[in-house]
Amino acid sequence: RMLEGYKSEFGGTITELKEEWLAERDRLSKVVFNREDFNPEIKSHFSQNILNEYADVLNTELPQTTALLTINDTIDPDSIIICAAGSLPGDLQRLWHSEVPNTYHLEYGYSCMGYEVSGTLGLKLANPSKEVYSIVGDGSFLMLHSEFITAIQYNKKINVLLFDNSGYGCINNLQMDFGNGSYYCEFRTDDNQILNIDYAKVAEGYGAKAYRANTVEELKAALKDAKKQDKSTLIEMKVLPKTMTDGYEGSWWNLGVPEVSNQEGVQKAYELKQEKLKKAKQY
């Protein structure tokens, strides 16, 4: 009775924000790469020539957000996903649409690289009748995926969805945002050639059913076929670097920046940090 007749002050704001989010989600699901003037979500880091080099070596033009939203729209709503580290948790937080409770399992706080695959096995043990999916980058997969073999060994079917941009993409973004060059976060050889690791072949060697999906059509087909399997699967997606979501307005990481530097980018990063700290809450 105390709330009888109460109306929220939000009015139509929530509806407007949801419509704005859906429009942005739709845009990011349809990103198309081109070799002349491609404008990725993470801007001003890699030149067009470098992006073209990745497209050639990895044999792909698939943006990360397009791949992720294709997965969201293709797998069953009651499937369970898990993710932990890299740029993918941020993408999921901004873009993933969950329709069924307890189907979205994210480890945000500690960014535990390698938790994804082992956590997926745990999800399967707790939910044996459901399809479970590990959403993982190539960096985290290389860090730890030993429980993938355990899942195969004990016939506990899990699905690994591996986003391969040939590097530690999230940390590469971070170092370049703070005025540095690209420093040892790209997977390149000592003569600067991009690595193209065949993760599907690795998975096949373990005894899993493996797929290579570098287009939306290939990804949809792989997801549908993987669901039919009675053993663990891995879908390898080669995705272009710098095609994850950006931070949008207000998102900022408080990291150490040198107060003194002869690099203009570092100087600007330090000035930005001081501006942001003035706006931060004093706990």
Model region roles, listed by residue range:
Residues 1-11, 69, 90-91, 95-283:
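Thiamine diphosphate
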Residues 1-35, 227:
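Glycine-rich, acidic loop regions that bind phosphate or pyrophosphate groups
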Residues 9-16, 45-46, 53, 62-63, ...:
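Secondary-structure junction/capping motif
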Residues 17, 21-25, 42, 46, ...:
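Generic structural signal of hydrophobic/aromatic residues within well-ordered alpha-helices
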Residues 18, 22-24, 28, 39, ...:
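A diffuse structural propensity rather than consistent per-protein peaks
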Residues 24-26, 42, 100, 256-257:
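Short, isolated positions within intrinsically disordered regulatory regions of eukaryotic proteins
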Residues 31-118, 123:
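Active-site diphosphate/adenylate-binding microenvironment
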